[in-house]
Amino acid sequence: MMIIVMLLLSYLIGAFPSGFVIGKLFFKKDIRQFGSGNTGATNSFRVLGRPAGFLVTFLDIFKGFITVFFPLWLPVHADGPISTFFTNGLIVGLFAILGHVYPVYLKFQGGKAVATSAGVVLGVNPILLLILAIIFFIILKIFKYVSLASIVAAICCVIGSLIIQDYILLVVSFLVSIILIIRHRSNIARIFRGEEPKIKWM
């Protein structure tokens, strides 16, 4: 029972809509009505500006990061293969990612999982996250598309999990990559049409 409570708590924390709350609280804006209509960090930068964008990014990363440690902090006990699986920090973090993408507070219309996924990886393997961040910024520098850099980094996480033979990370990163591609499908279409906005600060 406590495992279910932990996973639900992880989902609810992940579902906290940082961009929406910051936009409403400090700018009196519903971020969903501007830019891409997304509640995540990238649209927060675009609509609310850099300070708010950095705050939303931090909060979204923190959501994923903190949930990874729930199995250590909460009174959950694994007494079999199924309970062991669901008390793995990566699996608990996955529920936070799902909450971010499909938040119950906003009728299941949330962000694209990039920052929250980064927080989960930070919690379980900081060195891997550093490598992925380097890849992300290299792709971003070359092509100027946040969406493309995010997808490439996610796919590299799948490859990295194979290299280090972390098969739970492989499952989670594969699922997250699929979610990322689905959530970025409109961005992908705009890239092919030459209509996707490029960043201007790199």
Swiss-Prot record:
Main localization, broad class: membrane
The entry's keywords: Cell membrane, Lipid biosynthesis, Lipid metabolism, Membrane, Phospholipid biosynthesis, Phospholipid metabolism, Transferase, Transmembrane, Transmembrane helix
Record EC number: 2.3.1.275
Enzyme kind, highest EC tier: transferase
Membrane topology category: Multi-pass membrane protein
Associated pathway: Lipid metabolism; phospholipid metabolism
Listed transmembrane segments: 2-22, 54-74, 85-105, 120-140, 141-161, 162-182
GO molecular function: acyl-phosphate glycerol-3-phosphate acyltransferase activity
A Gene Ontology cellular-component term: plasma membrane
SMART domains: G3P_acyltransf
Subcellular location(s) per record: Cell membrane
Family: Belongs to the PlsY family.
Protein name: Glycerol-3-phosphate acyltransferase
Native source organism of the sequence: Staphylococcus aureus (strain bovine RF122 / ET3-1)
